[in-house]
Amino acid sequence: AQITFKVELPTALEIIILVFIFSAEILGEISEFYLVFPFWDTVLHTLNGFLAAAIGFSLVDLLNRSDRTVFSLSPLFTAIVAFCFSMTIGVVWEFFEFGMDMIMELDMQKDTVIHTIRSVMLDPGGHNVPYAIQNITDVAVNGQSLGLGGYLDIGLLDTMQDLIVNFIGAAVFSVLGFFYVKSRWQEALYREEKRMTETF
């Protein structure tokens, strides 16, 4: 038998999601807020972790509260599912950014100027030992200085920072969600025990 669910996200969550999309696409890309405000990308990825966890949490909570299914997840499991859902969304988004950079020749994985690099490819002995170049103040490509004041890291630091702040946003919401569901779960158990006691 097929079971259908009427999915209703809280109005406040829907508004926040729309504001997030506007902030990322209209302000971030078109109005170039990513360039004007260096923290813009970090704030949005943190918020993304929070929102994706909220959506994952809402979906699991929908199943928990539905009368059509025998489905009751513990508060801890609900929080874990919300966290994993958020991290999966974050990783898939980074795949999307990488794909757009490779296929469409964009620059969604923003570059970072750094002053130290370490690589085993630079080891003169050809061994698996990281060789460091420190205090980099300029880099030349094909004999032409880039004038950036350091070495240009193409996307790695941006990707890792995005995933880390996504992790933080997801973790914060999952912890808050855990305590919210736990309190509601305990209230439901109390009401059920009270009903059983009154029955007998």
PLM region descriptions:
Residues 30-41, 87-173:
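Interfacial helix-loop-helix junctions of multi-pass membrane proteins
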Residues 19-24, 48-56, 78-93:
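Alpha-helical transmembrane segments of multi-pass integral membrane proteins
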Residues 2-12, 68-73:
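Membrane-interface helix-boundary motifs at transmembrane edges
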